[in-house]
């Protein structure tokens, strides 16, 4: 994303873009790296950056010999809204998932397990049976995780990788 595009992206995010997802790719090695790039390099106002709900970080993971690399999602962080100038110093980022290199898996953090996600609670507040019931919400997250894992296993077993594409995932949800 370039400066003019970044400003347009954040304007769409701030106004809600008719309640649709507004997403962009911004290169940064961490949530703070994304913030720094958006605010300092692309000149998006700090108040506009607060329209960001989450930052997903993908990075290559290398083999010990350095000859092989695999791209992995290594961090999923929520952006809180209560900070004023520096989201890192003011605890404006909350990690919900972190990559475990030993297991080659993305794992939930204690914050996610304990229900410290304003985004997920906001979504849950509009679902009967989930509003105010973090255990039900988290159980559903775990169930969906098992379903996605099974889809991957079936896709590998049958070599039908269309099962992993958005069209099928939309239907399977």
Language-model features: locations:
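Terminal-proximal interaction/regulatory segments of ATP-powered molecular machines
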Residues: 128-173
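Conserved P-loop NTPase
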Residues: 54-147
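A hydrophobic alpha-helix/topogenic segment detector
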Residues: 36, 46-48, 64, 167-169, ...
């Amino acid at each position: 994303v370039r400066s003019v595009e970044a400003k347009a992206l954040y304007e769409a995010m701030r106004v809600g873009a008719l309640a649709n997802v507004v997403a962009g790719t911004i290169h940064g090695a961490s949530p703070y790296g994304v913030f720094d790039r958006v605010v300092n390099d692309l000149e998006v106002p700090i108040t506009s950056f607060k329209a960001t709900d989450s930052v997903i970080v993908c990075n290559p993971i290398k083999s010990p010999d350095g000859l092989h690399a695999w791209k992995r999602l290594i961090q999923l962080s929520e952006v809180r809204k209560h900070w004023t100038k520096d989201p890192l110093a003011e605890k404006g980022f909350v990690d919900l998932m972190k990559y475990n290199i030993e297991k080659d898996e993305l794992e939930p953090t204690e914050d996610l397990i304990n229900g410290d996600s304003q985004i997920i609670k906001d979504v849950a507040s509009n679902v009967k049976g989930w509003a105010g019931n973090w255990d039900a919400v988290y159980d559903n997250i775990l169930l969906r995780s098992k379903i996605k894992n099974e889809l991957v296993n079936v896709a590998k077993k049958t070599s039908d990788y269309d099962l992993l594409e958005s069209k099928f995932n939309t239907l399977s949800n």
